[in-house]
Design a protein with these regions (language model features):
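Short, low-hydrophobicity acidic/polar segments
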Residues: 1-145, 171, 177-192, 227-229, ...
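Short aromatic-acidic-glycine turn motif
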Residues: 142-155
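Generic structural detector for well-ordered beta-strands
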Residues: 109-111, 122, 139, 186, ...
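Extended serine/threonine-enriched, polar tracts that run as long, contiguous segments within proteins
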Residues: 179-253
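Pro/Thr/Gly/Ala/Ser-biased low-complexity repeat segments characteristic
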Residues: 163-171
Length: 303
């Protein structure tokens, strides 16, 4: 089946009061016999404007396109609170093969697996001095925004994705510009969160920007980087930007994202590059950590 139409050409199962049941009673299905083996496939959630699925006997596919959910234009004010209009979807799938009526007393048990990668960013300074970095905005550039995931026999892997070839040089927002919401990072701080929230990406490898080439050349070559709009101050004097101006600093970025993993990148500030690839102070370094994806509310992610 596929997800065309409200019926989804499949069976819609929903949870009410802690119990899973048929959303539409007319969709109820019965076991043919007590010992007939059946294979079951599930996708959660069913579908939306950013992803779809198509299952046949020979192939089971889920197509997904990422959305720049933290961009300023995606937010609206509701009851005095800035809320997103659209958000990315944590798409999961589950497979239960060779099930009979006797396997689990007539119930089909699913263990869902994530098909996307989750990414968050933190920042800290490098030097043992009074350097202060004032961050106004952050974005990530040059990655594939979507593709098709083929459900594998084993565990999900990056190789199960066929990317759609649509690169994103204009970038996705990590931290949007908000008045009074700039982030100040000093050596005395532990690494500070600089993401507006966890980001979801199609699993893929990113090739970092090859400095000293320009940002324009990086976009042509589809090389990845972070753009950080910030000020850098030491001893009361501005090394980058000014009291009244934030400036753009660029950082080469590489990644190897796998499905179902959460990646935590800590930017260690000591400098970076301008748009022409010229160094500003010293290059920013990275510390990276990866965790199995933990089911935590997006508004309260313990990193």
């Amino acid at each position: 089946g596929n997800d065309s139409g409200l019926a989804n050409n499949g069976i819609n199962i929903s949870c009410k009061s802690g119990n899973w049941s048929y959303t539409n009673p007319s969709d109820i299905r019965y076991w043919p016999t007590t010992d007939t083996k059946l294979n079951f496939y599930a996708v959660n959630p069913g579908s939306n404007r950013f992803f779809s699925w198509k299952f046949s006997n020979s192939k089971k596919e889920i197509s997904y396109v990422c959305f720049n959910e933290y961009q300023t234009s995606n937010f609206t004010i509701e009851n005095g609170v800035n809320k997103p209009i659209h958000t990315n979807t944590d798409v999961m799938y589950a497979v239960a093969k060779d099930q009979t009526h006797e396997t689990n007393k007539g119930k089909v048990k699913f263990k869902f697996k994530h098909i996307l990668s989750q990414v968050v960013f933190k920042a800290k300074t490098q030097y043992d001095n009074d350097m202060e970095v004032d961050i106004n905005a952050v974005s990530i550039h040059n990655f594939q925004i979507g593709g098709t995931f083929t459900i594998p026999e084993g565990e999900p892997a990056q190789s199960n994705w066929t990317l759609n070839g649509k690169n994103q040089p204009s970038g996705f927002t990590v931290k949007k510009v908000e008045e009074g919401k700039n982030i100040k990072v000093t050596l005395s701080d532990n690494a500070k969160d600089i993401s507006d929230g966890p980001m979801l990406f199609v699993p893929q490898k990113l090739t970092k920007w090859a400095v000293p080439s320009t940002i324009a050349a990086a976009n042509t070559a589809k090389q990845s980087y972070l753009k950080i709009t910030c000020k850098i101050k030491q001893g009361g004097a501005f090394l980058f930007g000014s009291n009244t101006e934030y400036k753009d600093l660029y950082v080469p970025f590489e990644a190897d994202w796998q499905p179902g993993k959460r990646y935590i990148y800590t930017l260690i500030f000591g400098g970076g590059y301008d748009a022409d690839g010229n160094p500003i102070l010293q290059p920013i370094n990275f510390e990276a950590a990866v965790d199995d994806w933990k089911e935590e509310p997006e508004s309260n992610v313990d990193l």
